[in-house]
């Protein structure tokens, strides 16, 4: 229980003149219970002075009139925006890949259709440099993954970096200017920046939002497939070329471990790349996973590795042991690729901006 005194130490005008706070005394009733004897002692305690709001909705703090402004902080996730560039007459696109703790990735495009990234808020570099650093080393590997993308092609032509080691060194120079880079130091820094649980944390809400936005099913449902999509394990045809992908089929495609789908949109073929996650309950419908309380989708490659190398009787215990690999706290390579692809899709009119 508590109460505030009706009388203030200073009136509103006096508080302003004396550089004081317009406030009143706050009292609370405290109770001390002796658990051995059962004795209860109650006492009223003066807790401190509590600022009072004026009739105009302000507070006077140390003689100055202040207002309280709520500060909204975005939760971890992937956020996308676009705007019209009046100089070039084109739309430009930006994105922030934001963890709870750790390095940000910030994407941006310019009027020349060059796709850049800022790693941990440093100076921008071509996004293809980042792609080379995570394993897509050659131009052809990048083209093969993303398909025919004018923005990617323009960025490849702009990027002077052509190997994975050069890419790691370039990122190291941006993060540690003035230090002499080595390939090993650059690789360790990059790996620690994004793939170390101690330095990077999406939190549960971040992982949920990543999977929700970057997952394949949500992005291909109600779209027309450009190719016939077949389950690689069973040979089952999910959808034929030219057919619309229903929500149910989209989820089945994703849970089969298929992570890339080409769709037809406005008379062109557009590639959709997911972040490599699946619903573990759909993949293992006959395994009782209720004790593990899985609510998030899991990394398909890790799950497949467990299934292929574990006796059925040991599945549940192995899945429990490798939970942090299945539901990583860090960003994954698949997340990065999907987040880049999402912005490319946005430039074609697919997906939605957040701002």
Q: Positions of the model-derived regions?
A:
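N-terminal non-catalytic structural scaffold regions of very large proteins
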Residues: 1-355
